[in-house]
Amino acid sequence: MATGKILQITGVVIDAEFPADGLPQIYNALEIPLGEGRSSLICEVQQQLGDSVVRAVAMSTTDGLVRGMDVIDTGAPISVPVGPETLGRVFDVQGRPIDGEGAVGTTKTMPIHRPAPTFEEQSNRAELFETGIKVIDLIAPFTKGGKTGVFGGAGVGKTVIIQELISNIAKEQSGYSVFAGVGERSREGNDLIHEMKDSKIPGTDQTVFDKTVMVFGQMNEPPGARLRVALSALTMAEYFREEGRDVLLFVDNIFRFTQAGSEVSALLGRMPSQVGYQPTLGTEMGELQERITSTKTGSITSLQAVYVPADDYTDPAPATTFAHLDATISLERSISEKGIYPAVDPLASTSRILDPNIVGEEHYRVATEVQRMLQRYKDLQDIIAILGVEELSDDDKLTVSRARKLERFFSQPFGVAEVFTNIPGKYVAVGDTVKSFARVLAGEFDHIPESFFFMKGGIDDVVAAYDASKQ
């Protein structure tokens, strides 16, 4: 292992000189010993500048570094621990436990930079993945082994949907999940860990946390850590996939990955591109997204929260992410303002597998009919605002009445939000969702006021609440 010296420190970017015959390769991890009582600082090589000098980005704070300090080339990229022993643990970008529970009981490690599966290794089966959330399962169904993006501005409920899905999958499907906290609030990460530890899996003494690996590089971390933490989490998920498992990867928030890349790019002296983003935006996103895929041995199903700056979907960061997704779930502020949660816009959300050959004729028919009715209601809203509902034709009055019921029926109580709403969470199977919406469309519940459809699980809950109100 070659040893060099620090030449220059600019924020989190470090220039180091090495012997000509020991120049570190791009993406190699460099180690800077910090002396007594402090763990070493790890940097990642980003550029070879010539004259045996490399430029690297630090994975933690550069406080206390001075020129002339020793830098050791580890000869390999950053590696993280993998295997079942990582379940129920919390890690940082370097794979070091940050939960105070001691060392991880595994010696297996994998580098965070790996090639994506080849065409021959990839699987192209299209299969619906049940989430238990009505609006998602009906309108924008997940693809098993696919990528879904949850788009929304600040405070419309992206993180809550992710928390509910982790909980549902652990309880209903006994699956493993990997959670990457990329540049989000540490408080939310802390809340998530405690909620998962309190959430028991029915019929066992295990909690949801015991089936989840958590990797954090939060807002207070340097941009290098926020840029690489998604790769660390993905590497842990890839191990489970190669062992033949179907694993879930949650990334909250993929926009912060792009944002960190932009910061690193500026520090490395690259010319900024559109709206100040890095010129390598598409390449960086592609390198991450192409690794999130299904192979013939197992699958990684991914859900990514995507912050939309100023609710502008044409911003390069969300626009670049769109290209990689199989399904998009769009959260609208106008829906959350009505108090309807999850605030999913059924007209703006899409899925590649909403196809009669995959989800079945009945599911496809009900989903498209629901969208048609909601679109008609949206078209009529201008007329209603000017003239009032009474001026509509009888057919349009019926459409408006049913559309308002559908809109409220898309709301659903979440288990993870029970402490705020005091309503127990509901998991609704896909079959029940399709049947319930088909019955509402058919007019079977035209006699029930729309308020009874709000915050219910299946249609039986609506009927039960209505019957109870008459007694």
From Swiss-Prot:
| Location in the cell | Cell membrane
- Its EC top class is translocase
One family from Pfam that matches here is ATP-synt_ab
Q: Enumerate the InterPro entries for this protein.
A: AAA+_ATPase, ATP-synt_VA_C, ATP_synth_F1_bsu, ATPase_a/bsu_AS, ATPase_alpha/beta_chains, ATPase_F1/V1/A1_a/bsu_N, ATPase_F1/V1/A1_a/bsu_N_sf, ATPase_F1/V1/A1_a/bsu_nucl-bd
| Residues annotated as binding ATP | G152, G153, A154, G155, V156, G157, K158, T159
Q: Does the keyword Membrane apply?
A: yes
Keyword Cell cycle attached: no
Q: What is its EC number?
A: 7.1.2.2
Provide the membrane topology annotation: Peripheral membrane protein
Q: Name one GO molecular function term.
A: ATP binding
Q: Which family does it belong to?
A: Belongs to the ATPase alpha/beta chains family.
UniProt protein name: ATP synthase subunit beta
Q: Which organism is it from?
A: Herpetosiphon aurantiacus (strain ATCC 23779 / DSM 785 / 114-95)
